[in-house]
């Protein structure tokens, strides 16, 4: 029973011990790292195929359609068929393109997202590397994808691709600021930049109830979630590849597997940012009986992450796309000030000489108050703008 309660860790220990019986220590360590990397890659690819299927089913349900239902049971293998189709497509390079940057960009888009997965704590004992600067590591590697998409747009020798690349810089860098500020609020509460440490800091509190940050700083979670939508380039922030404006955006000239790399990066990014939201705000692998049976942690983590992903897909089928001026104004005039207010509140409250429970109650009430005030101001501005348009139309 003890073996089953922490199944994956115990299998790893058994395999490591078995190899140590006839191999030198350096080769055992090398095999451990290589095998761990392979398991991570295979796991994320399977997760991406499943997430693509979930998106198609959720959106089709919202649009009163059936969705994929031909390839495999319930259409589960439709994404596999799409990959096989892309493998047969011709790889083309446009005339006048800067070939080195053009061919390097698809790889640079994918690899940073895979590297970030190494610091995500999937359960209590399953993590690639528990860095004490995990949050800083995520922020640093996350910026590489911005440069890669700009490389793709600039090197394609296409005006629509270049315009999409410019939008990458404007949108992703703008929304990265409030997202990082929201994560810093969680870091201040947890007192660590380790992703595993942030999860452990959300464990058993008053009456053994979890201290999930979504219930402590709900406004911080809202800022992070909206910013993450923009970082994923998801509706209503999909201006980087708006079909009606700039055709396919920065990867318009890519075909075959080069295009598939961008497609893969988009879905890995969706899984990754949802996993980060789970880690920082939803308690990560924390859940009932996880201390007695750590193997449950990976299922709790997967369920929470899937819940966030489904909500993202629901938004895709519900909201229209922003205009570029609305998108930029919302980032700098709304999200950045709100993120700074949350960060300031956390910095002040954690220094108060009161119990953690009282601190969290103060933070929750103040977050709700700021959120209601912000909604009131936004509603007033919207009414004023609508009235001006109405009067202008009469004139």
Language-model features, listed with the residues they occupy:
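Selective transmembrane helix interface/packing segments
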Residues: 1-395
